[in-house]
Amino acid sequence: MSDTSGPMDAPARAATPNPDLKVLDKLVGSWIASGDTDGTISYEWMEGGFFLVQHVDITLFGHRVKAIEMIGHLQPFGEQPSPDIRSRAYDNSGNTLDYVYEINGNELMIWGGEKGSPAYYKGQFSPDGNVNTGEWVYPDGGYKSTMTRVK
């Protein structure tokens, strides 16, 4: 008989989410997207508070885009959490897109791939936090986007 135990068999420990994830609370809720794109975007915390889940249903450049994104710290088996808040989005065209999230005050930065990438979103929250206006920038183009919270 062989021992097939692994990390999932370890006794449950009382893990708590990294406090830096709290900045993502600004995104929680349902939003209407407008500008060069239109549709709906929603964010909700996954049970446990380690990951923010984004649901996207928008039209961009005449194409419908549906996606789900998991946002939080990477933590492979046996390793420490990543220092950056990272995400991976999966869309209805088969793309997997990786990002790094930063929220400083009312500024939202989403880097495509790694920090400092030439592909990024830079947006500004209104003082009440119910509107985020910004622009996706990437080497061959970009687009303007406004998200308005509806609940």
Task: Explain the meaning of each model-derived region.
Residues 1-151:
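Hydrophobic small-molecule pocket/channel-lining residues, especially in calycin-type beta-barrels
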